Amino acid sequence: CQACQEYMGLGIIVGKSGQGKTHALKKYAELPRVAYIECDDTMACRDLVEAIENGIGLPKGYGGTIWSRVNRIREFFNTNEGFLLIIDEADKLINKYTQKKMEILRGIFDQSNVGIVIAGEPRLETELKGNLARFANRMDFYYKLKGLSKNEVVDYLEGYEVDEAAMGEMISRATNTQSGCFRLLDRTLNNVLRILKQKGETRITMKIVSEASNMMML
């Protein structure tokens, strides 16, 4: 993200669901001159343009055609250099019938002084290489998430009182290659903290983790 913002580059981040893409991107988006857009399957071209307008703070109510609104977005980025536009869940913008929404993003990048990061599940990379060569060959930066390491889990739980057995279970939930991911770790921790609050306790034990697990669909 930092490289794309600094050098006005185009980057892609891919990773499986639950590996922490959205969490990390939202954290970065707290920095100045960063606009974060989260996409979904129902978005039309006009919805994408409106989301970008809202993300960069353009006044509402201008209306106009998609072309004219995209031009205003380009003008904004050319006037306000140093911005990064993050498009999360970008794989949801592509289907077998149309790639128009990705072409809108390509047009903004080509004609604006702005860095763009698109992020999504692994099929995003496949779709770009197979069906959107004009987008793929513009990529300056690429990063593929590999999941959390043991040390990263320990760092994430820093500040909490966790016994050895509970720590081992939390590490497994985050790093297990079959079902482990950041989302499972985060959900487990949130439930653990709820239980601790109810009990008036502070120490995370294996018993508490088991109670938290009973509240979840695993």
Give the location of each predicted region.
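Loop/turn-to-beta-strand initiation segments
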Residues: 9, 80-85, 111-119
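C-terminal alpha-helical "lid" subdomain
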Residues: 20-24, 147, 151-218
